[in-house]
Amino acid sequence: MTPMRKSNPIMKMINHSLIDLPTPSNISMWWNFGSLLAFCLILQIITGLFLAMHYSPDTSSAFSSIAHITRDVNHGWIIRYLHANGASMFFICLFLHVGRSLYYGSFLLLKTWNTGIMLLFLTMATAFMGYVLPWGQMSFWGATVITNLLSAIPYIGTDLVQWVWGGYSIGNPTLSRFFTLHFTLPFIITALTTVHLLFLHETGSNNPCGISSDSDKITFHPYYTIKDILGLILLLFILTALTLLSPDLLNDPDNYTPADPLNTPPHIKPEWYFLFAYAILRSVPNKLGGVLALFLSILILSIIPMLHNSKQQSMMFRPLSQFLFWLLITTLLTLTWIGSQPVSQPFILIGQLASMTYFTTILILMPLTSLIENNLLKWT
Protein backbone atom coordinates (compact mmCIF):
# COMPACT_ATOMS: atom_id res chain seq x y z
CA MET A 1 0.00 0.00 0.00
CA THR A 2 1.30 3.48 -0.97
CA PRO A 3 2.14 5.64 2.08
CA MET A 4 -0.22 8.59 2.62
CA ARG A 5 2.64 11.07 2.10
CA LYS A 6 2.90 9.80 -1.49
CA SER A 7 -0.81 9.60 -2.32
CA ASN A 8 -2.43 12.61 -0.61
CA PRO A 9 -2.02 15.72 -2.86
CA ILE A 10 -1.03 18.09 -0.01
CA MET A 11 1.18 15.52 1.76
CA LYS A 12 2.80 14.70 -1.59
CA MET A 13 3.90 18.33 -1.93
CA ILE A 14 5.37 18.35 1.60
CA ASN A 15 6.98 14.96 0.93
CA HIS A 16 8.75 16.23 -2.21
CA SER A 17 9.97 19.34 -0.37
CA LEU A 18 10.98 18.02 3.06
CA ILE A 19 11.05 14.22 3.23
CA ASP A 20 12.01 12.42 0.01
CA LEU A 21 13.82 15.45 -1.45
CA PRO A 22 17.06 14.26 -3.15
CA THR A 23 19.89 16.18 -1.43
CA PRO A 24 23.68 16.19 -2.04
CA SER A 25 25.35 13.89 0.49
CA ASN A 26 28.20 16.32 1.28
CA ILE A 27 26.47 19.60 2.19
CA SER A 28 27.81 21.08 5.43
CA MET A 29 26.30 23.02 8.35
CA TRP A 30 26.47 26.16 6.17
CA TRP A 31 23.38 24.85 4.39
CA ASN A 32 21.41 24.94 7.68
CA PHE A 33 20.60 28.63 7.50
CA GLY A 34 17.70 28.24 5.07
CA SER A 35 15.69 26.24 7.60
CA LEU A 36 16.81 28.57 10.42
CA LEU A 37 15.53 31.55 8.42
CA ALA A 38 12.18 29.79 7.99
CA PHE A 39 12.05 29.29 11.77
CA CYS A 40 12.95 32.96 12.41
CA LEU A 41 10.21 34.09 10.00
CA ILE A 42 7.58 31.93 11.75
CA LEU A 43 8.76 33.18 15.17
CA GLN A 44 8.57 36.82 14.02
CA ILE A 45 5.05 36.36 12.61
CA ILE A 46 3.75 34.65 15.78
CA THR A 47 5.33 37.11 18.26
CA GLY A 48 4.37 40.01 15.97
CA LEU A 49 0.71 38.93 15.95
CA PHE A 50 0.61 38.90 19.76
CA LEU A 51 2.30 42.31 19.93
CA ALA A 52 -0.14 43.75 17.35
CA MET A 53 -3.04 42.75 19.62
CA HIS A 54 -1.83 45.26 22.24
CA TYR A 55 -0.01 47.88 20.13
CA SER A 56 -1.59 51.23 19.30
CA PRO A 57 -0.39 52.81 16.00
CA ASP A 58 -0.96 56.38 17.16
CA THR A 59 1.74 58.97 17.93
CA SER A 60 0.11 59.87 21.25
CA SER A 61 -0.11 56.29 22.56
CA ALA A 62 2.45 54.15 20.62
CA PHE A 63 5.27 54.60 23.16
CA SER A 64 2.99 53.99 26.17
CA SER A 65 1.45 50.92 24.47
CA ILE A 66 4.96 49.39 24.24
CA ALA A 67 5.48 50.15 27.95
CA HIS A 68 2.06 48.58 28.64
CA ILE A 69 3.05 45.41 26.71
CA THR A 70 6.33 45.16 28.67
CA ARG A 71 4.84 45.85 32.12
CA ASP A 72 1.19 44.81 32.19
CA VAL A 73 0.54 42.15 29.52
CA ASN A 74 1.01 38.57 30.72
CA HIS A 75 4.46 37.48 29.44
CA GLY A 76 4.43 40.62 27.26
CA TRP A 77 8.07 41.40 28.06
CA ILE A 78 9.33 38.06 26.69
CA ILE A 79 7.14 38.33 23.57
CA ARG A 80 8.49 41.82 22.92
CA TYR A 81 12.15 40.88 23.47
CA LEU A 82 11.81 37.65 21.47
CA HIS A 83 10.48 39.77 18.59
CA ALA A 84 13.25 42.39 18.89
CA ASN A 85 16.12 39.92 19.34
CA GLY A 86 14.50 37.49 16.89
CA ALA A 87 14.98 40.19 14.23
CA SER A 88 18.70 40.32 15.08
CA MET A 89 18.97 36.52 14.82
CA PHE A 90 17.04 36.71 11.53
CA PHE A 91 19.63 39.08 10.06
CA ILE A 92 22.59 37.10 11.41
CA CYS A 93 21.20 33.99 9.65
CA LEU A 94 20.40 36.06 6.55
CA PHE A 95 23.95 37.47 6.25
CA LEU A 96 25.50 34.03 6.84
CA HIS A 97 23.14 32.53 4.23
CA VAL A 98 24.18 35.15 1.63
CA GLY A 99 27.86 34.76 2.61
CA ARG A 100 27.68 30.99 2.12
CA SER A 101 26.09 31.47 -1.32
CA LEU A 102 28.91 33.84 -2.30
CA TYR A 103 31.64 31.52 -1.04
CA TYR A 104 30.31 28.33 -2.60
CA GLY A 105 29.03 29.89 -5.85
CA SER A 106 25.32 29.21 -5.22
CA PHE A 107 24.57 32.55 -6.94
CA LEU A 108 24.84 30.69 -10.26
CA LEU A 109 21.36 29.27 -9.54
CA LEU A 110 20.02 32.54 -10.99
CA LYS A 111 16.29 32.29 -10.25
CA THR A 112 16.90 31.24 -6.65
CA TRP A 113 19.55 33.97 -6.21
CA ASN A 114 17.36 36.77 -7.61
CA THR A 115 14.34 35.82 -5.49
CA GLY A 116 16.74 35.73 -2.53
CA ILE A 117 17.83 39.33 -3.23
CA MET A 118 14.17 40.37 -3.38
CA LEU A 119 13.62 38.64 -0.02
CA LEU A 120 16.62 40.51 1.43
CA PHE A 121 15.21 43.87 0.31
CA LEU A 122 11.74 43.08 1.67
CA THR A 123 13.15 41.89 5.01
CA MET A 124 15.25 45.06 5.35
CA ALA A 125 12.20 47.23 4.56
CA THR A 126 10.10 45.32 7.11
CA ALA A 127 12.77 45.62 9.82
CA PHE A 128 13.20 49.36 9.17
CA MET A 129 9.46 49.97 9.56
CA GLY A 130 9.39 47.83 12.70
CA TYR A 131 12.14 50.01 14.20
CA VAL A 132 9.88 53.06 13.81
CA LEU A 133 6.88 51.55 15.65
CA PRO A 134 8.02 51.98 19.31
CA TRP A 135 8.02 55.76 18.60
CA GLY A 136 11.09 56.45 20.70
CA GLN A 137 13.72 59.09 19.88
CA MET A 138 15.75 56.83 17.60
CA SER A 139 12.57 55.54 15.92
CA PHE A 140 11.45 59.07 15.06
CA TRP A 141 14.80 60.49 13.97
CA GLY A 142 15.87 57.29 12.18
CA ALA A 143 12.64 57.39 10.17
CA THR A 144 13.13 61.13 9.47
CA VAL A 145 16.69 60.66 8.18
CA ILE A 146 16.05 57.53 6.08
CA THR A 147 12.75 58.66 4.50
CA ASN A 148 14.32 62.07 3.79
CA LEU A 149 16.81 60.32 1.50
CA LEU A 150 14.03 60.08 -1.10
CA SER A 151 14.26 63.87 -1.47
CA ALA A 152 17.60 63.29 -3.27
CA ILE A 153 15.67 61.92 -6.28
CA PRO A 154 15.62 64.72 -8.87
CA TYR A 155 12.36 66.54 -9.65
CA ILE A 156 9.94 64.24 -7.75
CA GLY A 157 11.98 63.81 -4.52
CA THR A 158 10.17 66.32 -2.27
CA ASP A 159 6.71 65.19 -3.40
CA LEU A 160 7.71 61.57 -2.86
CA VAL A 161 8.87 62.25 0.72
CA GLN A 162 5.61 64.05 1.56
CA TRP A 163 3.65 61.20 -0.01
CA VAL A 164 5.49 58.65 2.18
CA TRP A 165 5.04 60.83 5.27
CA GLY A 166 1.37 61.53 4.57
CA GLY A 167 1.99 65.20 5.40
CA TYR A 168 4.72 67.84 5.71
CA SER A 169 6.53 66.00 8.50
CA ILE A 170 6.61 62.56 10.11
CA GLY A 171 3.47 62.08 12.17
CA ASN A 172 0.38 59.99 12.74
CA PRO A 173 -0.24 59.02 9.05
CA THR A 174 3.41 57.87 8.77
CA LEU A 175 3.21 55.67 11.87
CA SER A 176 -0.15 54.27 10.77
CA ARG A 177 1.05 53.25 7.29
CA PHE A 178 4.35 51.91 8.62
CA PHE A 179 2.43 49.67 11.05
CA THR A 180 0.15 48.45 8.23
CA LEU A 181 3.12 47.63 5.98
CA HIS A 182 5.13 46.08 8.83
CA PHE A 183 2.17 43.80 9.55
CA THR A 184 1.56 42.86 5.88
CA LEU A 185 5.07 42.42 4.48
CA PRO A 186 5.99 39.24 6.45
CA PHE A 187 3.13 37.41 4.71
CA ILE A 188 4.44 38.60 1.32
CA ILE A 189 7.91 37.42 2.43
CA THR A 190 6.39 34.00 3.27
CA ALA A 191 4.85 33.77 -0.22
CA LEU A 192 8.15 34.78 -1.86
CA THR A 193 10.00 32.22 0.30
CA THR A 194 7.78 29.53 -1.26
CA VAL A 195 8.81 30.77 -4.73
CA HIS A 196 12.47 30.80 -3.56
CA LEU A 197 12.15 27.13 -2.50
CA LEU A 198 10.30 26.24 -5.71
CA PHE A 199 13.20 27.53 -7.82
CA LEU A 200 15.75 25.82 -5.55
CA HIS A 201 14.04 22.43 -5.88
CA GLU A 202 13.89 22.91 -9.65
CA THR A 203 17.69 22.77 -9.89
CA GLY A 204 18.62 21.08 -6.61
CA SER A 205 21.07 22.36 -4.00
CA ASN A 206 24.67 23.28 -4.70
CA ASN A 207 27.39 21.58 -2.61
CA PRO A 208 30.76 22.68 -1.10
CA CYS A 209 32.77 21.28 -4.03
CA GLY A 210 30.65 23.16 -6.58
CA ILE A 211 30.32 20.07 -8.79
CA SER A 212 27.28 18.09 -9.93
CA SER A 213 25.96 15.80 -7.21
CA ASP A 214 23.44 13.92 -9.38
CA SER A 215 25.35 10.65 -8.90
CA ASP A 216 25.45 10.91 -5.10
CA LYS A 217 22.24 12.05 -3.39
CA ILE A 218 20.41 11.04 -0.22
CA THR A 219 16.91 11.74 1.09
CA PHE A 220 16.41 14.91 3.11
CA HIS A 221 14.76 12.97 5.94
CA PRO A 222 16.17 11.67 8.29
CA TYR A 223 19.73 12.82 7.50
CA TYR A 224 19.24 16.56 7.07
CA THR A 225 16.20 16.93 9.33
CA ILE A 226 18.43 15.81 12.23
CA LYS A 227 21.16 18.19 11.08
CA ASP A 228 18.67 21.08 10.86
CA ILE A 229 17.29 20.30 14.33
CA LEU A 230 20.83 20.59 15.75
CA GLY A 231 21.19 24.03 14.14
CA LEU A 232 17.77 24.99 15.47
CA ILE A 233 18.72 23.98 19.04
CA LEU A 234 21.88 26.14 18.83
CA LEU A 235 19.87 29.09 17.48
CA LEU A 236 17.24 28.71 20.23
CA PHE A 237 19.98 28.54 22.86
CA ILE A 238 21.59 31.80 21.65
CA LEU A 239 18.22 33.57 21.23
CA THR A 240 16.98 32.44 24.67
CA ALA A 241 20.25 33.46 26.35
CA LEU A 242 20.14 36.87 24.67
CA THR A 243 16.46 37.44 25.50
CA LEU A 244 16.65 36.34 29.14
CA LEU A 245 20.13 37.52 30.16
CA SER A 246 20.72 40.68 28.14
CA PRO A 247 17.54 41.66 26.24
CA ASP A 248 18.64 45.24 25.52
CA LEU A 249 22.16 44.41 24.36
CA LEU A 250 21.39 45.20 20.70
CA ASN A 251 18.85 47.99 21.35
CA ASP A 252 19.56 51.72 21.41
CA PRO A 253 19.15 53.43 24.83
CA ASP A 254 17.75 56.53 23.04
CA ASN A 255 14.69 54.50 22.07
CA TYR A 256 13.60 54.45 25.71
CA THR A 257 12.93 58.19 25.47
CA PRO A 258 9.59 59.15 23.83
CA ALA A 259 9.90 60.75 20.36
CA ASP A 260 10.54 64.49 20.54
CA PRO A 261 10.61 66.42 17.22
CA LEU A 262 12.26 69.41 18.99
CA ASN A 263 15.20 67.48 20.44
CA THR A 264 17.67 65.78 18.09
CA PRO A 265 19.76 62.89 19.54
CA PRO A 266 23.55 63.50 19.39
CA HIS A 267 24.07 60.54 17.05
CA ILE A 268 21.28 59.18 14.84
CA LYS A 269 21.85 55.59 13.73
CA PRO A 270 19.71 52.64 12.56
CA GLU A 271 19.69 49.11 13.98
CA TRP A 272 23.07 47.29 13.95
CA TYR A 273 22.17 45.17 10.89
CA PHE A 274 21.84 48.30 8.70
CA LEU A 275 25.02 50.01 9.93
CA PHE A 276 27.21 48.79 7.02
CA ALA A 277 24.84 50.34 4.45
CA TYR A 278 24.47 53.48 6.61
CA ALA A 279 28.28 53.85 6.72
CA ILE A 280 28.43 53.60 2.89
CA LEU A 281 25.68 56.24 2.65
CA ARG A 282 27.62 58.61 4.94
CA SER A 283 30.95 58.07 3.17
CA VAL A 284 29.73 59.87 0.01
CA PRO A 285 29.66 63.68 0.51
CA ASN A 286 26.94 64.19 -2.14
CA LYS A 287 23.35 63.35 -1.05
CA LEU A 288 22.21 61.70 -4.31
CA GLY A 289 25.54 59.87 -4.62
CA GLY A 290 25.16 58.58 -1.07
CA VAL A 291 21.64 57.29 -1.74
CA LEU A 292 22.82 55.54 -4.93
CA ALA A 293 25.77 53.99 -3.06
CA LEU A 294 23.37 52.82 -0.33
CA PHE A 295 21.11 50.98 -2.79
CA LEU A 296 24.05 49.70 -4.85
CA SER A 297 25.63 48.16 -1.74
CA ILE A 298 22.77 45.60 -1.82
CA LEU A 299 21.90 45.67 -5.56
CA ILE A 300 25.51 44.78 -6.39
CA LEU A 301 24.61 41.22 -5.35
CA SER A 302 22.44 40.90 -8.48
CA ILE A 303 25.41 41.40 -10.84
CA ILE A 304 27.75 38.96 -9.06
CA PRO A 305 26.69 36.04 -11.36
CA MET A 306 27.69 38.19 -14.38
CA LEU A 307 31.10 38.96 -12.84
CA HIS A 308 31.82 35.27 -12.16
CA ASN A 309 34.42 34.13 -14.70
CA SER A 310 36.18 31.34 -12.81
CA LYS A 311 36.30 27.82 -14.21
CA GLN A 312 35.26 26.56 -10.77
CA GLN A 313 31.92 27.33 -9.13
CA SER A 314 33.02 27.13 -5.49
CA MET A 315 35.87 29.01 -3.76
CA MET A 316 36.82 25.81 -1.92
CA PHE A 317 39.91 25.24 -4.08
CA ARG A 318 40.69 28.91 -4.90
CA PRO A 319 42.95 30.36 -2.17
CA LEU A 320 43.35 33.79 -3.81
CA SER A 321 39.58 34.24 -4.10
CA GLN A 322 39.21 33.02 -0.51
CA PHE A 323 41.54 35.82 0.63
CA LEU A 324 39.37 38.40 -1.18
CA PHE A 325 36.20 36.90 0.28
CA TRP A 326 37.52 37.29 3.82
CA LEU A 327 38.74 40.80 2.94
CA LEU A 328 35.14 41.56 1.94
CA ILE A 329 33.81 40.19 5.26
CA THR A 330 36.39 42.25 7.21
CA THR A 331 35.39 45.34 5.21
CA LEU A 332 31.70 44.79 6.05
CA LEU A 333 32.52 44.39 9.76
CA THR A 334 34.60 47.60 9.61
CA LEU A 335 31.69 49.43 7.92
CA THR A 336 29.31 48.15 10.63
CA TRP A 337 31.63 49.58 13.30
CA ILE A 338 32.03 52.90 11.43
CA GLY A 339 28.25 53.25 11.07
CA SER A 340 27.91 53.23 14.86
CA GLN A 341 30.51 56.00 15.32
CA PRO A 342 29.93 59.78 15.19
CA VAL A 343 30.62 61.71 11.95
CA SER A 344 34.15 62.90 12.73
CA GLN A 345 37.74 62.06 11.84
CA PRO A 346 39.24 59.45 11.65
CA PHE A 347 35.88 57.63 11.21
CA ILE A 348 34.98 59.56 8.03
CA LEU A 349 38.24 58.56 6.31
CA ILE A 350 38.07 54.92 7.48
CA GLY A 351 34.44 54.75 6.24
CA GLN A 352 35.41 56.13 2.81
CA LEU A 353 38.33 53.70 2.48
CA ALA A 354 36.17 50.74 3.58
CA SER A 355 33.37 51.72 1.15
CA MET A 356 35.88 51.98 -1.70
CA THR A 357 37.38 48.59 -0.74
CA TYR A 358 33.88 47.01 -0.66
CA PHE A 359 32.97 48.05 -4.23
CA THR A 360 36.51 47.55 -5.63
CA THR A 361 36.76 44.01 -4.23
CA ILE A 362 33.45 42.89 -5.79
CA LEU A 363 33.64 44.77 -9.11
CA ILE A 364 37.36 44.58 -9.97
CA LEU A 365 39.51 42.40 -7.70
CA MET A 366 37.35 39.25 -7.58
CA PRO A 367 36.88 38.92 -11.39
CA LEU A 368 40.60 39.66 -11.97
CA THR A 369 41.66 37.10 -9.37
CA SER A 370 39.43 34.47 -11.00
CA LEU A 371 41.23 35.07 -14.33
CA ILE A 372 44.63 34.78 -12.61
CA GLU A 373 43.55 31.50 -10.97
CA ASN A 374 42.35 30.15 -14.32
CA ASN A 375 45.76 30.90 -15.83
CA LEU A 376 47.62 29.45 -12.85
CA LEU A 377 45.76 26.18 -13.37
CA LYS A 378 46.46 26.38 -17.13
CA TRP A 379 42.74 26.06 -17.85
CA THR A 380 42.58 28.80 -20.48
UniProtKB/Swiss-Prot annotation:
Q: Which domain of life is it from?
A: Eukaryota
Specify which residues bind a ubiquinone according to the UniProt entry for this protein. Answer: 201
Q: Which GO terms describe its biological process?
A: mitochondrial electron transport, ubiquinol to cytochrome c
Q: Mind telling me what this protein is named?
A: Cytochrome b
Task: Relate the protein's function as given in its record.
Answer: Component of the ubiquinol-cytochrome c reductase complex (complex III or cytochrome b-c1 complex) that is part of the mitochondrial respiratory chain. The b-c1 complex mediates electron transfer from ubiquinol to cytochrome c. Contributes to the generation of a proton gradient across the mitochondrial membrane that is then used for ATP synthesis.
Tell me which species this is from: Chlorocebus aethiops
Instruction: Please list the cofactors this protein needs.
Output: heme b
Query: Does the record carry Glycoprotein as a key word?
Result: no
Which cellular compartments is it found in?
Mitochondrion inner membrane
> What main location does UniProt list?
mitochondrion
Q: Where does heme b b566 bind?
A: 97, 196
Its family?
A: Belongs to the cytochrome b family.
**Gene from which the chain derives:** MT-CYB
What's its membrane topology? Multi-pass membrane protein
Fetch the Gene3D superfamilies from UniProt. Answer: Cytochrome Bc1 Complex, Chain C
Which regions span the lipid bilayer? 33-53, 77-98, 113-133, 178-198, 226-246, 288-308, 320-340, 347-367
